Amino acid sequence: MIAIDIAAEKLDFARTVGAHRTIHGDRENDIAERVREISGGGAHVSVDALGNSVTCRNSISGLRKHGKHIQVGLLSGAESMPAIPMDSVISNELEILGSHGMQAHRYPAMLDMILARKLQPAKLVGKTIHLDELPTHLAKMDGFNGTGVTVVDRFR
């Protein structure tokens, strides 16, 4: 797995949860080329979890022939119409999939993996907050601060 970000702390975090290699996006002239170099021809699967037109394009451009791109990050506002490199999509027979998350019927298999400790979602939690703090945290989401996900775990 190759993780790409512009924040060193997030790349460090990615290594702790399984990234084999990392790329600091601000230090590379051509991120897609770097992915192809590291992976020996391009990624089999890419995921844009950020929802940014640049990350979406780079993610698709770093795929190998017959690769699959999964768009999880929501592209909205000015980012809602990314420039998709359709020439590469067609010539490399790429697959592009949009996803809002796992289908409910797959939850039992995921929960079995958690019970077997094959998945450890607690490692992805960066911060826990009280429900009263939620509006403040939601308002700051576009700043992409911190690592991991924030979980509301206190309600009273």
Where are these regions (language model features)?
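Acidic carboxylate diad motif detector
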Residues: 72-73
